Amino acid sequence: MATFKLIVVSAEQHIFNGEVKGIQATGSEGELGILAGHLPLLTAIKPGIIKITLEDDTEEVIYISGGFLEVQPTIVTVLADVAIRGKELDRERILEAKRKAEQNIVSGAKDANYEMLVSKLSRELAKLRAYELTDRLTQRKR
């Protein structure tokens, strides 16, 4: 299967730079599957995960807080606000942040608006999904 170059960068650092067989992400209009030879595309990406299929058919997961995805003939670039490899996520920290976000929504915290609270919860759920998918992929390798 043909490959293409994928670059994933966040505001702080380069997260990924290498040849891949494909990626899956959530764009502003829905789910995207990108393989070599995909038509050029520029789209906003929603908070969630990017699932990468590497040259050796192993998979890697990266949490993205949002950003942009650009497809060119031989290169795909993801510009993310925040990007964290699934293997670098801390489950306990995510669960604690999720619990606090849920608690703030239920209690109607007066210092934040509802949309911000729901957005925070959504980001924590996406991180948890990235962590769990990475964990499953790691167990499958064993």
From Swiss-Prot:
Regions that span the bilayer: none
InterPro entries: ATP_F1_dsu/esu_C_sf, ATP_synth_F1_dsu/esu, ATP_synth_F1_dsu/esu_N, ATPsynth_dsu/esu_N
Cell inner membrane keyword on record: yes
Subcellular location: Cell inner membrane
One matching Pfam family: ATP-synt_DE_N
Coiled-coil regions listed in the entry: none
Molecular function terms, GO-annotated: ATP binding; proton-transporting ATP synthase activity, rotational mechanism
SUPFAM superfamilies for the chain: Epsilon subunit of F1F0-ATP synthase C-terminal domain, Epsilon subunit of F1F0-ATP synthase N-terminal domain
Membrane topology reported for the UniProt record: Peripheral membrane protein
Key words, A-Z: ATP synthesis, Cell inner membrane, Cell membrane, CF(1), Hydrogen ion transport, Ion transport, Membrane, Transport
GO cellular component, one term: plasma membrane
CDD domains: F1-ATPase_delta
Domain of life: Bacteria
PANTHER family for this protein: ATP SYNTHASE DELTA/EPSILON CHAIN, ATP SYNTHASE EPSILON CHAIN, CHLOROPLASTIC
Subunit structure: F-type ATPases have 2 components, CF(1) - the catalytic core - and CF(0) - the membrane proton channel. CF(1) has five subunits: alpha(3), beta(3), gamma(1), delta(1), epsilon(1). CF(0) has three main subunits: a, b and c.
Function: Produces ATP from ADP in the presence of a proton gradient across the membrane.
Family statement drawn from the similarity comment of this UniProt entry: Belongs to the ATPase epsilon chain family.
Protein name, entry field: ATP synthase epsilon chain
Organism: Histophilus somni (strain 129Pt) (Haemophilus somnus)
Gene: atpC
